[in-house]
Amino acid sequence: MKVNLMLKRGLATATATASSAPPKIKVGVLLSRIPIIKSELNELEKKYYEYQSELEKRLMWTFPAYFYFKKGTVAEHKFLSLQKGPISKKNGIWFPRGIPDIKHGRERSTKQEVKLSDDSTVAFSNNQKEQSKDDVNRPVIPNDRITEADRSNDMKSLERQLSRTLYLLVKDKSGTWKFPNFDLSDESKPLHVHAENELKLLSGDQIYTWSVSATPIGVLQDERNRTAEFIVKSHILAGKFDLVASKNDAFEDFAWLTKGEISEYVPKDYFNKTEFLLADN
């Protein structure tokens, strides 16, 4: 009876000792590429900016024709002949949009439209063709929002999804996608410094990152494996990420993904634990 009691006490002590052992510390990196261009406007935003633009044009100053065309010259006469003058106020006539409010030859309740002669338009078009790329007066032609990486569906390129936030994910040897994580080999260094050093060892010196804070933004606890992964938030500033085969034995592939794409790659429980850390845009 005494032996059985001592055996039970020994088993209870061993169980308590095993459960009180500290978990293994790991460092995860939430490396993001912030949006490069603005997101596309929805219908409400388009209507709002269109209204503000029209309102600004209506309230702007009247075009100073006297400054550009000397009074009594042929140039002034040619310019005035091209302009569509406003309808002046007349007695006995009903105006459904209100009585015209004309100042300096312009209806102030609407925007002013200035027309130029065909000669000026042709000359301007010819100058556009002759302008070189170094000319500061050349017309600004924006690049396409859809890049070549979007067309080819290149998940490893930083040039895709320019209006969205991209996050770096890696695939381990078991085929599971997740954020990069590393074992804490040197406890004398802060977590964010250790994460930056391990990330450079993983991808080489061709990547430049910036840690948002020395404080982790979250922790993933794995009760089964007795690990605690502290996640450090970081941004890529320049360069690119590419797995270096000679310095990597844990991961076999990587991708830059949006929040919606991450939900399709990682396990569901992993995404539920990290979803609140990801940006919607």
UniProtKB/Swiss-Prot annotation:
Bias (Basic and acidic residues) ranges? 106-118
Q: Which InterPro entries match?
A: Ribosomal_mL46, Ribosomal_mL46_N, Ribosomal_mL46_NUDIX
**Any GO BP:** mitochondrial translation
Region described as Disordered: spans on this chain: 106-141
UniProt biased composition (Polar residues): 119-129
Q: What Gene3D superfamilies has UniProt attached to this entry?
A: Nucleoside Triphosphate Pyrophosphohydrolase
- Signal peptide range equals none
Functional summary from the UniProt entry = Component of the mitochondrial ribosome (mitoribosome), a dedicated translation machinery responsible for the synthesis of mitochondrial genome-encoded proteins, including at least some of the essential transmembrane subunits of the mitochondrial respiratory chain. The mitoribosomes are attached to the mitochondrial inner membrane and translation products are cotranslationally integrated into the membrane.
* Name the UniProt record assigns to this protein: Large ribosomal subunit protein mL46
Organism from which the protein derives = Saccharomyces cerevisiae (strain ATCC 204508 / S288c)
Q: Which gene encodes it?
A: MRPL17
